[in-house]
Amino acid sequence: SPRIVNMFTIGDDLLRGSGETLPDGRAFGPRIEALIVYNSNPVAVAPQSRQVTAGFRREDLFTVVLEHFLTDTADHADYVLPATTQLEHWDVHASYGHTYLVINEPALTPRGQARSNAAIFRALAQRMGFADACFQDDDQTLARQAIHGPVPFEQLREIGWAKLPLPEA
């Protein structure tokens, strides 16, 4: 079954065996046999780079990377699928460095065979037979659904950004 791998422990997690005991006493679960990496380059940025690289070099690990550059992680992938850039898809952004919410509208048509991460996951869901309504939502609908709170989607589209109403520190 799918699970999320913590970027901080990805090196160790890719090297763990099935049922191995974690430092907190929990069982690790089944060995990771397949991995889809997107919006990240763990081989270059994750801690414990030796373990991360060793994990990605496993012959029995099936890895797909959604990317618009051939990154260090993409070098270890079985498949690299061309992902759109920020200029080519809908998105909503917040940041660690500021307190604004930003809408990202596509300014360009995707080049070549590039698709947004969400479009790639929708196609994968369809191929796997998932017919739930949530797998039909387009990127703009997902961006709209991601916005909760005091800033309406249409206002954000009109202005492009909004200061989040957070208490002063």
Where are these regions (language model features)?
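Short low-complexity, flexible loop/linker segments enriched in glycine and/or proline
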Residues: 79-81, 96-99
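Extended redox/cofactor-interaction regions of prokaryotic respiratory oxidoreductases
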Residues: 1-75, 85-92, 155-169
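Short acidic (Asp/Glu) and glycine-rich catalytic loops that position anionic groups and cofactors
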Residues: 31-36, 97-106
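Short, well-ordered loop/turn and helix-capping segments at boundaries between secondary-structure elements
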Residues: 58, 62, 79-86, 123-133
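Flexible domain-boundary/linker segments
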Residues: 52, 80, 90, 141-142
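Short beta-alpha connecting loops at secondary-structure transitions
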Residues: 84-87, 100-110
